[in-house]
UniProtKB/Swiss-Prot annotation:
Zn(2+) binds at H13, E16, H103. Belongs to the AspA/AstE family. Aspartoacylase subfamily. This is Probable aspartoacylase. GO terms for molecular function: aspartoacylase activity; hydrolase activity, acting on ester bonds; zinc ion binding. Keywords: Hydrolase, Metal-binding, Zinc. Its cofactor is Zn(2+). It comes from Prochlorococcus marinus (strain MIT 9515). The keyword Signal does not apply. Binds 1 zinc ion per subunit. It catalyses: an N-acyl-L-aspartate + H2O = a carboxylate + L-aspartate. GO terms for cellular component: cytosol. Substrate binds at R54, N61, R62, E161, Y271. Its EC number is 3.5.1.15.
């Protein structure tokens, strides 16, 4: 970390409003700056936030792979992605070393961490939070249909995902969880920097394997919904024969695979347009070399 600044992004999706309230409350309490690390707060997609919609033209959190040499100013989210990188990127006018992207979900994900790829500094931050709070980690990788995430535009970054909460609905419990994470993150980094804390030797992650669409008829319309026994069961294993969907006649469509899966984002409202009913993962234990802590501040 060279600048000692961390970018905290809220409302990357405009209808996820609890993070905005959280950072405003945190700021008013005088917690923006300490002697070691400075937080920079920004609303990711302010126009979508004003309108209460997820995005204007395109999902901002799928736009950061499109900004290089892209001069199409007609797409609001690409303009916004360019602005964020030009201002807060490592070579920007107000450079930040780390980006933390705050999100809410309608799925029963609890408080969780999302990582994109296997960058060592990301593992370092994720391990600190998992060790302190026991948070599950969703490692999203190797999905060609899902790319261009905000935190990938910084050398280190994580998504904090909290749910369930409805879109455009304030929930004090959700807000409080964000406040705890925002406060604790800086404390943990300071402890690590001052050699007051050791990195855990391992981290447990749920590695993305793919996504499942709703069953559909020949007309392309959804003809079965998530099974009642599967709803709200994020992070809980699915084994062969377990129910996944139920159609209008009450018939169950079950999982027929051999391997145990761990589902995430079950029934996420925003993913319906992406033809995703849920994503599924496998568990992996990753050993963390002590060297990544030393490299974190270089």
């Amino acid at each position: 970390m060279n600048s000692g600044k961390i970018l905290i992004v809220s409302s990357t999706h405009g209808n996820e409003i609890n993070p905005v309230w959280s950072v405003n409350q945190y700021s008013k309490q005088g917690n923006i700056i300490d002697k070691n690390i400075e937080y920079k707060f920004i609303i990711g997609n302010p126009l979508a936030y004003e309108k209460g919609c997820r995005y204007i033209d395109k999902d901002l959190n799928r736009s950061f792979n499109l900004i290089k040499n892209n001069h199409d100013t007609s797409i609001y989210e690409i303009r916004r992605a360019n602005f964020l990188v030009e201002k807060f990127g490592v070579n920007g006018s107000e450079p930040c070393d780390i980006a933390i992207d705050l999100h809410t979900t309608t799925a029963n994900m609890g408080t969780s961490i999302v990582m994109y790829g296997r960058r060592e500094k990301d593992f370092c931050l994720a391990a600190l939070l998992q060790h302190k709070f026991g948070l599950p980690i969703y490692l999203h990788e190797k999905d060609e249909k899902q790319t261009g995430f905000l935190v990938e535009a910084w050398p280190c970054g994580l998504v904090i995902e909290i749910g369930p909460v409805a879109q455009n609905f304030y929930d004090p419990k959700i807000i409080n969880r964000f406040l705890i994470i925002i406060s604790s993150l800086r404390e943990e980094i300071n402890k690590l920097k001052n050699k007051q804390k050791q990195l855990p030797k391992l981290v447990i992650v749920h590695v993305h394997q793919g996504s499942i669409d709703y069953p559909r008829g020949e007309d392309g319309n959804i003809n079965a919904l998530i099974h009642p026994k599967r709803m709200n069961q994020d992070w809980k294993p699915i084994k062969k024969g377990d129910p996944l969907f139920m159609d209008m006649e009450g018939c169950t469509k079950s999982y027929n695979g051999k391997n145990t899966l761990w589902p995430v984002f079950i029934g996420e409202v925003a993913y319906k347009e992406k033809n995703i009913a849920m994503s599924y993962t496998k568990k992996e234990v990753i050993n963390l070399p002590t060297q990544i802590c030393e490299d974190f501040f270089n």
